[in-house]
Amino acid sequence: MDCPDGVADLRFVPLALDCRRRYTLRSVPTNPKPVTLFEVARRAIEISDPANADPRLGELLGQFEDADEPVTAIQNLEERVAIAVEGVDVEIDDPAVSMAAASIFYLARRRDELRADPSAILRLAARAEWKGDPPERVADWLADRGIKV
C-alpha cells in the first residue's frame, strides 16, 4: 500500500497505518488488573496455612470474600482487617491469625511480592508489622516454620 495522497509528513499518519510498510499494528501497553483485598487476603492466608487446616484462618478469609475493590482504593484497611481479625480471634492470641493479618498489610503495600516465596513474605511481614521484634508467640510460630525474623 502506498501512502495516502497528500501525506508528506508521517507524523500525521494514523498509528495503525505506517506508509512505509503494510499495515502495522503497534502494541498498546495495558495496565495490570488491580489487586483486590480478597486476593491479598487469600494469598496471606495461603501463606499462613498452606495445608488449609486452621478453621480460624478459613473464617478470616470468609470475612473478605466480598472484598472485590482494589486494595489501593481502601482508605481504612487497618480498621477492616482489625475488625475481621477480632471476628475470628477475640483475644488476638492466635499467632497464625496475627501473621495472616500482618501479611495482608504487607502484601497490600507490596503487591509486587504477591507471588514471592512464602517464607520471605512471612519474614518481611513480621519485620514490617513488629519492627523486627514480633511477640513471643508469633516468633515461636515462625521458628516452627524455620523462619528467623
Predicted regions and their residues:
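Acidic, polar-rich N-terminal leader regions of halophilic archaeal proteins
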Residues: D2-V149
